[in-house]
Amino acid sequence: DVDERTRKTGEAFAAGLAPDCAITVHTQADTSSPDPLFNPLKTGVCQLDNANVTDAILSRAGGSIADFTGHRQTAFRELERVLNFPQSNLCLKREKQDESCSLTQALPSELKVSADNVSLTGAVSLASMLTEIFLLQQAQGMPEPGWGRITDSHQWNTLLSLHNAQ
């Protein structure tokens, strides 16, 4: 790919893999536009068939995005615990109105498919991003990933299932 982080990662990998060899990392000359090798959709090299992609994803999701999130409620509840979401202004307000409050209710997830992109929005997207951040905190040796609220492998596995699901 053409972004600096990817190029620098390639250079570091090559230097670590073969420190005594002068391995050149190759990228396309124009780093201001997407590389078709890594981004064939964004560069228009190919396009998605919206109906087929949607059907395939929903089939894999269990029929709908609601089913997809429904099957992962245990993991979402664990994420809510780490985030202290029940104490958020939104949930406290809903509690006063005798309404339930969850990430999946507050941020409904939606599948978006176009000729050049597929994305999941809402709680699914947020959960994937946040759990990856927690994983990076752990990998970087931070003493208390997730504000110190992730303490055992079961919690890690549960949370990372949200990242892996997307």
Regions found by a protein language model. Give the residues of each.
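Signature for phosphate-centric chemistry
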Residues: D3-Q166
